[in-house]
Design a protein with these regions (language model features):
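Rossmann-fold dehydrogenase core element
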Residues: 64-74
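Hinge/cleft segment of the Venus flytrap/periplasmic-binding protein
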Residues: 87-144
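Hydrophobic alpha-helical
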Residues: 1-60
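Structural signal for conserved beta-strand scaffold positions within catalytic alpha/beta enzyme cores
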Residues: 50, 73-74, 133
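Generic structural signal for alpha-helix termini and adjacent loop/cap motifs
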Residues: 17, 64, 91-95
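Hydrophobic alpha-helical segments within soluble ligand-binding/sensing domains
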Residues: 6-8, 53-59, 75-104
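Short, well-ordered alpha-helices that flank and scaffold nucleotide-derived cofactor binding pockets
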Residues: 37, 41, 63, 86, ...
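Active-site nucleophile and cofactor-binding loops and adjacent substrate-binding regions
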Residues: 25-28, 73-78
C-alpha cells in the first residue's frame, strides 16, 4: 500500500535537501497529490508532474506560478476497463492464448498484441496515457 504520509515526507525532504529543485515527477496518484499539497502549502516554485487523478489534482493544475502542476497523466479508466473486457473475451473465445505475439481486435480501441512483461509473464498495453492540463481538467474532475 502506498501511504500519503511517506510521499509528504519525501517531498519535504527533497525541498529541504535541494532548495533549487525545479521539478518532481511522481509515479503514483497518491504521491502526486501529496507532493502537490506540500508544494502549494510551502509556496514552492518547484513544478510537479506524473500520474494523478483529476478529482484529487484539479486544484493544483494550472499554467501559472500559483499552481504546482502544469499537467499530469493517467490512463482513461473506461478504456482500461474496455480493453480488459475485450482481452478476457478474446481469451474465453480462444482467439488468443495469452502468449506473446497473439493479436486481437478490441472493438473501436483497435488492434492489440500480447507482449512479454518484465516479470516473465505477458501483458496487453493500452497505450499512451491521457494528458490533463488547465484546459481540460474541469471536464474530468467529477469523473474520477
Amino acid at each position: 500500500m502506498i501511504e500519503p504520509q511517506k510521499s509528504t515526507d519525501v517531498t519535504q525532504a527533497l525541498l529541504q535537501t535541494y532548495p533549487d529543485l525545479k521539478v518532481i515527477c511522481a509515479p503514483t496518484t497518491v504521491g502526486i497529490a501529496a507532493a502537490a499539497k506540500v508544494l502549494q502549502d510551502n509556496g514552492s516554485s518547484c513544478k510537479l508532474t506524473g500520474l494523478g487523478l483529476p478529482s484529487e489534482m484539479s486544484e493544483y493544475i494550472g499554467d501559472d506560478d500559483a499552481h504546482s502542476c502544469p499537467y499530469m497523466f493517467l490512463w482513461n479508466p473506461e478504456d482500461v476497463g474496455r480493453l480488459g473486457a475485450y482481452t478476457s473475451i478474446a481469451l474465453v473465445n480462444e482467439e488468443i492464448t495469452g502468449a506473446a505475439g497473439d493479436k486481437f481486435t478490441a472493438g473501436d480501441l483497435g488492434e492489440y498484441e500480447v507482449t512479454e512483461a518484465s516479470d516473465g509473464g505477458t501483458e496487453v498495453i493500452l497505450g499512451s496515457p491521457f494528458k490533463f492540463d488547465p484546459f481540460n481538467i474541469d471536464e474530468w474532475k467529477d469523473v474520477y
